[in-house]
Amino acid sequence: MFPSPALTPTPFSVKDILNLEQQQRSLAAAGELSARLEATLAPSSCMLAAFKPEAYAGPEAAAPGLPELRAELGRAPSPAKCASAFPAAPAFYPRAYSDPDPAKDPRAEKKELCALQKAVELEKTEADNAERPRARRRRKPRVLFSQAQVYELERRFKQQRYLSAPERDQLASVLKLTSTQVKIWFQNRRYKCKRQRQDQTLELVGLPPPPPPPARRIAVPVLVRDGKPCLGDSAPYAPAYGVGLNPYGYNAYPAYPGYGGAACSPGYSCTAAYPAGPSPAQPATAAANNNFVNFGVGDLNAVQSPGIPQSNSGVSTLHGIRAW
């Protein structure tokens, strides 16, 4: 059997590779711890101004976790050993607590913190102002004019609606007012007149026209119905002027001697009582002696001369009338 060759340490063994990973992890943890420690020990100036200054009691009292961090850093291997074991591997050196971080400028961090604090204070102030009710602006009291002042202003306004500056100053001095008060009064008065004219114009335009007079109702008799005259057959109508037609009383005339009174009916028919007349052979003599003739109204119309027009043709429709 051949003797085993001497074991020479090589940087590529499993143990060396595992040790390398552990060393890298420990170095990363050390860098993170150093960053935390630096943030704990170096607060910003804005934060320091917000708190009361206290007496310094040492790094252990200021940072409670400082001893544990130091113990962890002490157990970590030194960077020199790592560099000697792995010459080609990059070396990681833990930064001291007092060394500034080149990637982060402490002044920039302080500026950022101050800006954030100012923004927070500004938002808080705006919120307080929004919650607090705004004080209402106090209006100036209205100027109350006396009756004498108003009377004088109205009288001057009727004479002159626009005043120049000297005239306004003179009127103000007489009424013991300021020029501005007189000017404002005249402006308001002119505006009031303008509004009154506009209202009157609107009233005239919107006024409806007067209603027409009511139609007069006139009673008109029906003369023809279905092509036939219907004045005599129809019922008597009431005239528009309330003129009534009453039957004529024939008994008002004195009766002739030897004859009885005529008995008249409301239908315009009269029957007279005649004495015993002569024989039928002498009718003309008896008629001449008695001077009475019985005839109808239609016969009377026929006796009229043909030259005179018959204006009242409706008389012939009254039947049963006899005259003597």
Swiss-Prot record:
Q: What is the effect of changing residue 279 to F?
A: In ASD7; somatic mutation
State what changing residue 299 to G does. In ASD7; somatic mutation
The reported result of mutating residue 119 to S is:
In CHNG5; exhibits a significant functional impairment with reduction of transactivation properties and dominant-negative effect which was associated with reduced DNA binding
Which GO biological process annotations does it have?
adult heart development; aortic valve morphogenesis; apoptotic process involved in heart morphogenesis; atrial cardiac muscle cell development; atrial cardiac muscle tissue development; atrial septum morphogenesis; atrioventricular node cell development; atrioventricular node cell fate commitment
| Outcome of substituting residue 124 to R | In ASD7; somatic mutation
For whether the record's keyword set contains DNA-binding, the answer is yes
Q: What is the effect of changing residue 25 to C?
A: In ASD7, TOF, CHNG5, HLHS2 and CTHM; uncertain significance; exhibits significant functional impairment with reduction of transactivation properties and dominant-negative effect; the mutant protein activity on the DIO2, TG and TPO promoters is significantly impaired
Assembly, in brief, is: Homodimer (via the homeobox); binds DNA as homodimer. Interacts (via the homeobox) with TBX5 (via the T-box); this complex binds DNA. Interacts with HIPK1 and HIPK2, but not HIPK3. Interacts with the C-terminal zinc finger of GATA4 through its homeobox domain. Also interacts with JARID2 which represses its ability to activate transcription of ANF. Interacts with FBLIM1. Interacts with TBX18. Interacts with histone methyltransferase NSD2 (via HMG box). Interacts with NEDD9. Interacts with TBX1.
Q: What is this protein called?
A: Homeobox protein Nkx-2.5
* Species of the source: Homo sapiens (Human)
